[in-house]
Amino acid sequence: MKPKIGFNTDVFVEDSGRTVTRMNILYSDLIIQHGGIPVIFPPGVLPQEVASGLDGFFLIGGDDYKSSLPASGEIPDRYLEVHPRREETDLNWASWLIKSDLPVLGVCGGLQALCLAAGGTIYGDIESEVKDPIQHRRMGKGDLPSHIVQWQGFQEGGLPPGSFEVNSSHHQSVATLPTDWRILASTSDGIIEACCDPAERIIGIQWHPELNREEPLGHFILNRFIEQVRSRLELDSA
């Protein structure tokens, strides 16, 4: 039996004024190639109504959540607000997933949604809030490495600690982790590039394995997520 993995989607207002929901096909291709079935949810769907048929969930990247803005309300120059319907849906899903037993992988904005929902905080703009930051916004193609991260590793083992190039591109990031969460990878300026909950069931990364199929760290994490999903499915089927 193939595992069913849920996805959130983006909301975009076209030049014509028409509002559409969409998702980069590379996300679903990634899951199909790993033997899964993508189940794609538009904004407004309540997780408690549909999640019983899922074996895992993948929170995709996107623009900036209004919830990430500082208490002062100051809006960074690089701020690109995600559509309000998407923000509401993403944070509903993230809150529900944190309380569930589903394996979860969040990429870029998906990582930030999980941290916000679990009680963490976000830098609204790295360049204006972090001292001496490195370049986190990629200037070239999306599949190209942008900087190096220091990987700390999972408690259970697997890929050992080391340095890896990743195709990260973002101007926001996790500032403080939710209680008991821990850093999996970070950059030389201290920015968190990957983290997990205490059980290592919920994983978030800032970079994009869907854009680069050759990048080893992202695909180690993706393969581990798929293994967790399959293990859960086998237990449910036993």
PLM regions with names:
Residues 1-105, 116, 123, 127-157, ...:
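N-terminal beta1-alpha1 cap of cysteine-dependent amidohydrolase-like domains
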Residues 108, 170, 208:
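Active-site glycine-centered loops adjacent to acidic/histidine catalytic or metal-binding residues
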Residues 169-176:
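The feature captures the conserved acid-bearing segment of alpha/beta-hydrolase catalytic domains
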Residues 181-189:
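Short, Gly/Ser/Thr-enriched beta-strand-loop segments that form substrate-interacting elements
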